[in-house]
Curated annotation (Swiss-Prot):
The protein, known as: Probable inactive DNA (cytosine-5)-methyltransferase DRM3
InterPro entries: SAM-dependent_MTases_sf, SAM_MeTfrase_DRM
Domain UBA: 52-92, 198-242
Compositional bias (Basic and acidic residues): 339-350
């Protein structure tokens, strides 16, 4: 201890007091005050380290040693041997040249105070088990005056950025990474140097999302699902909605270019902005030559249950000449049992003879070598080749509003020549978020959009609301389920309005997140500054692609008008897939429309500039029939409209009469589910999108009868 007394050459009384502290430390001298917000359970958890190391360092600093020297001594020798640290620090102090002498009371020491304050924050962050280099990096970037909660957010953002940067590097195929290369060394392996540009970009997005009130887990999941290149608005929207697009960072044009470049020249087509259930038409490699089967190898989508389409199991004869067992006959529930005009059970093979089935690509033996599954959301559609006996007039189009299980699509495909359905995200053509399924025998080339061009976001569909739409409301699309309960939605808007008024129009980040979730769930819109409102029928008419005031007809209540939009096509999306009919029927066409709803198919064809020579519409809902009839009379149609109320009345005899009257049908279209008879009955969104097998059976029966007659 004599060495310690000689350290500064001053009186021994102060040194003696320090020795007293060493021998008899008071409990309070071992601690230091921290702000109340320095405890973060998600960072500390079970990994909180003991504070003994911090106490040793704090004690040495209080003894007057330089914090930098104390930290250096601890780094080099550890913190277990206090006497050794004391001896090293004493010798280091003795070897330093004496500084300028200050006499009297003027003896300022600003630098040690600054270092001590910085070191106090540093110790607090290290106690939370953050990496030392990230703590130093945060202090270097933000400064000691930054609140510790912002320090924590910054370090968490850096950790997330580092995590996804490492994952991105690991995913590079065939890339050899040199650990000595500074550009690819993770942040935790460096010092407080500046990370690369990608890390800074990810950190900035993470900090912005943290400021919006989202948790670390939510942000981490969003970045993991979408990727570090996703925009902040897309990341925030995915957290709010709980939906994560597979490849949102790729533009649709880029995807189409990639697929066009990869597809064989013989099958290169104009790719649509929708996605086929499975692609067929590419040449299949068979030794050195190609096969004419037209079956493409499709990689299975991980995480989704696979199933083979039973196209060959559902036809009269398989490619091996054996008739399948009848055990599938009872696969449907009793209430779904369908019959044809003669009272006979409708079977898949009734749609045509086996020879027509055998000409389709799925009827080859190779179908057993491939598993057909739902593709990822952004998997481009590949062209499909159908035999001449399948792809002929009358063309048919079956549209399923909402999602459907693979097992049901398997059964539907078995009834319709084994054709695979086309799954469509309506966001690609509109401001509506809904998945629809189409099964048809139309060509898939030379499609084009309806006019005027579709509006793809809420802001485009409602440009007059942009001036008062808050920046933190990052929604771009509406949900498919409309809020038909106007009373509940209005009360919700009033409650949110009072909350916004309480904070004088500036809600906190937590309030913004909560309001955004309500807006997404109930499809609320901003009709004035800080004022929300439910969607009105006029708004939905614009979003769904219908004429203004299309559903504004006498006898239709507001709630009933809103519910109609749960049972209708989005005409921009439908029109894109029907656009091929314009060149096929330049003089116009006759349409058999089953379960027409409010006339989505008819309006889509009219928007494409296709002349409707005649339309036979089957619709059980009286309000929907009146809406379609008024549109036909006011839109300048020169053809003939025949409306039928009950599908059961469309017997073979009546079909024959109608076909003689119109000269046959060029196009048969059906939407499922149909509009309910009682629109006043409350139905959940899941029930509204349920599959009605009886309705599909009627479509299959009528389509078969029409094709047999032509």
């Amino acid at each position: 201890m004599a060495d310690m007394r000689r350290r500064n050459g001053s009186g021994g009384s102060s040194n003696h007091e320090r020795n007293e502290q060493i021998l008899f430390p008071k409990p309070e001298t071992l601690d230091f005050d921290l702000p109340c917000d320095t405890s973060f359970p998600q960072q500390i958890g079970d990994n909180a380290a003991s504070s003994s190391g911090s106490n040793v360092k704090s004690l040495l600093i209080e003894m007057g040693f330089c914090p930098t020297l104390v930290q250096k001594a601890i780094d080099e020798n550890g913190q277990d041997d206090f006497e050794l640290l004391l001896e090293i620090l004493t010798k280091s102090t003795e070897t330093e040249p004496p500084g300028p002498s200050f006499h009297g009371l003027m003896e300022p020491k600003p630098e040690p105070d600054i270092e001590y304050e910085t070191d106090r924050i540093r110790i607090a962050l290290l106690t939370m088990k953050f990496p030392e280099n990230l703590v130093d990096f945060a202090l270097d970037r933000l400064g000691k005056d930054t609140p510790i909660d912002e320090m924590v957010d910054f370090i968490v953002a850096a950790q997330l950025a580092e995590k996804y940067a490492e994952e991105s590097e690991d995913s590079l195929d065939g890339a050899e990474i040199n650990e000595e290369d500074e550009d690819v060394t993770p942040v935790t392996a460096r010092g407080p140097e500046v990370p690369n540009e990608q890390l800074f970009e990810t950190m900035d997005k993470t900090l912005r999302l943290l400021e919006m009130g989202f948790s670390n887990d939510e942000i981490s999941m969003a970045i993991e699902k979408i990727g570090t290149k996703g925009q902040i608005s897309v990341l925030a929207e995915s957290i709010v909605t709980g939906e994560f697009p597979a490849e949102c960072h790729d533009d649709l044009e880029d995807i189409e270019k990639k697929v066009s470049a990869a597809a064989p020249a013989v099958n290169r087509t104009c790719l649509s902005k929708s996605w086929r259930f499975v692609g067929v038409g590419a040449q299949k490699e068979d030794g050195g030559g190609g096969s004419s089967s037209g079956t493409a190898n499709i990689k299975p989508d991980p995480g989704i249950e696979s199933f083979p389409f039973p196209a060959t199991d559902n036809v009269g004869e398989t490619s091996r000449g054996k008739r399948p067992k009848d055990e599938d006959e009872n696969a449907y529930p009793e209430e779904y049992t369908g019959y044809d005009d003669r009272g006979k059970r409708l079977r898949p093979e009734d749609m045509g003879d086996s020879s027509s089935f055998m000409e389709t690509p799925w009827m080859q033996d190779e179908w057993k070598d491939n598993t057909y599954e739902f593709p990822s959301v952004m998997q481009p559609r590949l062209s499909q080749s159908l035999g001449p006996k399948v792809a002929r007039r009358p063309y048919f189009f079956y549209g399923q509003l909402g999602e459907l299980s693979p097992s049901w699509w398997s059964k539907i495909s078995g009834f319709l020549f084994g054709i695979h359905p086309e799954h469509v995200d309506t966001r690609l053509c509109s401001a509506l978020r809904r998945t629809e399924g189409y099964l048809h025998n139309l060509p898939t080339v030379n499609r084009f959009n309806t006019l005027p061009n579709p509006r793809l976001t809420i802001q485009d569909a409602m440009p007059h609301m942009r001036s008062w739409w808050p920046q933190w409301d990052i929604r771009k699309h509406f949900n498919s389920g409309t809020c038909s309960n106007m009373k509940d939605a209005t009360l919700l808007c009033e409650r949110i309005g009072r909350r916004i008024a309480e904070c004088k129009g500036k809600p906190t980040q937590q309030d913004q997140t909560l309001i955004l979730r309500h807006c997404h769930t109930s499809n609320l819109i901003w009709i004035a500054p800080n004022i929300l409102s439910p969607l009105e029928p006029e708004h939905l008419e614009c979003i769904m692609g219908y004429p203004m005031n299309h559903t504004n007809i006498g006898g239709g209540r507001l709630a009933e008008r809103l519910k109609l939009f749960d049972y209708c096509f989005q005409t921009d999306t439908l029109g894109y897939h029907l656009s091929v009919l314009k060149s096929m029927f330049p003089q116009g066409l006759t349409v058999l429309s089953l379960f027409s709803g409010i006339g989505g198919a008819e309006i889509a064809l009219d928007r494409l500039g296709i002349h409707l020579k005649g339309v036979v519409s089957v619709e059980s809902c009286g309000l929907s029939r009146n809406i379609l009839k008024r549109w036909w009379q006011t839109s300048g149609q020169t053809g003939e409209l025949v409306q039928i109320e009950e599908i059961k009345s469309l017997t073979a005899k009546r079909l024959e009469t109608l076909m003689q009257r119109f000269g046959g049908f060029d196009f048969v279209i059906c939407q499922n589910p149909s509009t309910p008879l009682d629109l006043s009955k409350e139905i959940s969104n899941s029930e509204a999108c349920e599959f009605d097998y009886t309705l599909f059976n009627e479509f299959a029966r009528v389509t078969k009868r029409v094709r047999d007659m032509m």
